[in-house]
Amino acid sequence: MDGSGQQTDTMMSDAGAEQPPPAPQPVAGMDNIPATLSYGGRFIQYNIFGNIFEVTAKYKPPILPIGKGAYGIVCSALNSETIENVAIKKIANAFDNKIDAKRTLREIKLLRHMDHENIVAIRDIIPPPQREAFNDVYIAYELMDTDLHQIIRSNQGLSEEHCQYFLYQILRGLKYIHSANVLHRDLKPSNLLLNANCDLKICDFGLARVTSETDFMTEYVVTRWYRPPELLLNSSDYTAAIDIWSVGCIFTELMDRKPLFPGRDHVHQLRLIMELIGTPSEAEMEFLNENAKRYIRQLPLYRRQSFTEKFPHVHPAAIDLVEKMLTFDPRRRITVEGALAHPYLNSLHDISDEPICMTPFSFDFEQHALTEEQMKELIYRESLAFNPEYQHM
């Protein structure tokens, strides 16, 4: 589970239908978690799966565990001040690993900068009870019901309209992200959150980067199955087109209910791509370095498959759009604006309701090697922006 709280097997209503989302369900046997007041009643402690979960007192019981990941645990809770249910992610020992701490800081700063219906919102950064003992980070996000990965895996029926509406919302959110001079770099079904009203929100910006940056191999980028050829071939021609490739893979998986390119490793991943879209021509390889070109030339020659024959149940206009997204050469791949204006999305596209970010996001805070203490201070300041009353506590 990524970024926000989700649960499985949520029933999806017709696209756009007004229907309140179901309340998140507690994990079996965890519906009566005792709460202990701490720090003079300013905080509440819960023991969840043997982990201490400590939040400000405005988050009233009951608190419900809704997910667990490598980073820690996610619970839903009610903010008694705003009367809103939120998903609170605890990142345990958040500063032990510098790369992970930087990811957390990046996600917080990016999501606070962005304001869009198709991007998950941060509702709170919960301040630590003691500034000098700041080890765990608690981030409250708007609560969603499930994610696209869970829907694809379930036996939930999806109409053509559902798939079309989900694709439109992904592209609408991505247009805003790219307009902020940001690449998401890790788009995949589990990073696309949904509620029962079919609203879709993009989450998990921990790997996001500025569009002009080329030093991209410093961290793990894009889950392999959704990774474009230029990344698999270590190209330095690194543009917003990487996200478009991922969207093409996601949309195909949504319609076919199985991953398009489930590669076991880099080599297998590239082979699966070539088997579908064919070996690129010399012109299509122009952007690659000589090593990458040499590597492709020594591979078997693959003929392009017919997308129409491979996906006979898919609307021809959808096939045309997918082919434009899954173009080998990133310079020729359709842009997010081009995809939104494609005939397949005619019934949904409305340029006056597809806002852009007016202020490009600045990654200046990453220009210097931050110490653990500096990262703590920056995240602490973010928490005070939500909780100014804790400034002098």
From Swiss-Prot:
One function term, GO molecular function aspect: protein tyrosine kinase activity
Motif position, TXY: 218-220
InterPro entries noted in UniProt: Kinase-like_dom_sf (IPR011009), MAP_kinase (IPR050117), MAP_kinase_CS (IPR003527), Prot_kinase_dom (IPR000719), Protein_kinase_ATP_BS (IPR017441), Ser/Thr_kinase_AS (IPR008271)
EC number in record: 2.7.12.2
Regulation: Activated by threonine and tyrosine phosphorylation.
Protein kinase domain segment(s): 60-345
BP GO annotations: defense response; intracellular signal transduction
Keyword Membrane: no
Gene Ontology CC: cytoplasm; nucleus
Keyword match Kinase: yes
Catalysed reactions listed for this entry: L-tyrosyl-[protein] + ATP = O-phospho-L-tyrosyl-[protein] + ADP + H(+); L-seryl-[protein] + ATP = O-phospho-L-seryl-[protein] + ADP + H(+); L-threonyl-[protein] + ATP = O-phospho-L-threonyl-[protein] + ADP + H(+)
Residues the record lists as binding ATP: I66, G67, K68, G69, A70, Y71, G72, I73, V74, K89
Keywords, comma-separated and alphabetical: ATP-binding, Kinase, Nucleotide-binding, Plant defense, Serine/threonine-protein kinase, Transferase
Protein family (similarity comment): Belongs to the protein kinase superfamily. CMGC Ser/Thr protein kinase family. MAP kinase subfamily.
Record text on subunit structure and interactions: Interacts with SIPKK.
Purpose: Phosphorylates myelin basic protein (MBP) in vitro. May be involved in disease resistance.
Protein name stated in the entry: Mitogen-activated protein kinase SIPK
Organism, as annotated: Nicotiana tabacum
Gene that specifies this protein: SIPK
